Amino acid sequence: MKSVTVAGIDCGTNSIRLKVSRVSEDGVEDIGPRILRVIRLGQDVDKTHRFADEALARAYEAAREFAGVLAEHPVDGIRFVATSATRDAENREEFEDNIEKILGVRPEVIPGTEEADLSFLGATSIVHREVEAPYLVVDLGGGSTELVLGGDGVTHPSTQVQAAFSMNIGSVRMTERHLKNDPPTEGQIAEAVADIDAHIDEAFKTVPAGKTHTIIGVSGTVTTMTALAMGLTEYDHTAVDG
């Protein structure tokens, strides 16, 4: 297998990230820095169903930074995926057009089901083989959350998805919808919890979570909480991942 250098850009509701890797028979090797920028693209999208001008400006600024990195690390291909906020935004074509002008690649707006599958594949690819399946992958994003159950305990990384569900609850969406004060009131917290519980009850009609042996958390929300629990003063993905 000839080695190829590829770039992946993941544009979510709260953050956008870039990873450049060389893929060969020997595996995957990171090339250059991993970059994450908090752009809050989903600002007010839950309420207005449109991208705000200032949110688009932040996204374009990050895209221009990524273009500079890619100029230093030429790639054979780029995949740019956009998720929850872009799915919901009525003016997403403007976003897609401008990103294509900056990066030369058009954002691919993927459905929640594909987001769930990709989250599962990515998460299980770094799980140690001795971690027992089935796995429940929880991808808690800014605009949506995906629950994915799967894994046969043999295939690695696992592609054996048994059930998946994507729901419109996430850290940005719930904050804007319910948590109007800082700190939020007890009533606002109760409203958020009730909203989340209702969505989870619906998800569990599709995803038989009772079969889970290992829960795997994915996303900035999960890694931030993990870093806090570990007492990290600076975020270190090598300490948190896996």
PLM regions and their residue ranges:
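Beta-sandwich strand segments
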Residues: V28-D30, P157-Q160
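N-terminal glycine-rich anion-binding loops that anchor highly charged ligand groups
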Residues: G27-R40
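N-terminal basic/disordered segments at the start of proteins
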Residues: K2-D30
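Helical "lid/coupling" subdomains associated with nucleotide-phosphate turnover
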Residues: V4-V6, R22-V23, R40, D44-V75, ...
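Residues forming anionic-ligand binding surfaces in small-molecule and nucleic-acid pockets
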Residues: I78
